[in-house]
Swiss-Prot record:
Protein S19 forms a complex with S13 that binds strongly to the 16S ribosomal RNA. This is Small ribosomal subunit protein uS19. Keywords: Ribonucleoprotein, Ribosomal protein, RNA-binding, rRNA-binding. It comes from Leptothrix cholodnii (strain ATCC 51168 / LMG 8142 / SP-6). The gene is rpsS. One of its GO terms (cellular component) is small ribosomal subunit. The keyword Cell division does not apply. The keyword Acetylation does not apply.
Length: 91
């Protein structure tokens, strides 16, 4: 179920302040955040945000097609190591 339109998109205030500051001084360093739940706004376009995936910060360069999605969608938390090999096929 999506969020109500009258509420608007959710963005952590500290993340919004960091991004606005980075845009104002034209800083190219990634903005480090743990806020995977924040929605990407049009103000974030062109900024690299380092999103925490539980182990490390994954750099995410925000483009116009990402607007409206959550930051956590672009920093995967699970790694797939593959299914175990079939023992019958090894013979």
């Amino acid at each position: 179920m999506s969020r109500s339109l009258k509420k608007g998109p959710f963005v952590d205030h500290h993340l919004l302040a960091k991004v606005e500051k980075a845009v104002a001084i034209k800083d190219k360093k990634p903005v480090k955040t743990w806020s995977r739940r924040s929605t990407i706004l049009p103000e974030f376009i062109g900024v690299t945000i380092a999103v925490h995936n539980g182990k490390q910060h994954v750099p995410v360069y925000v483009t116009d097609q990402m607007v409206g999605h959550k930051l956590g969608e672009f920093a995967l938390t699970r790694t797939f190591k593959g299914h175990p090999a079939d023992k019958k096929a090894k013979r």
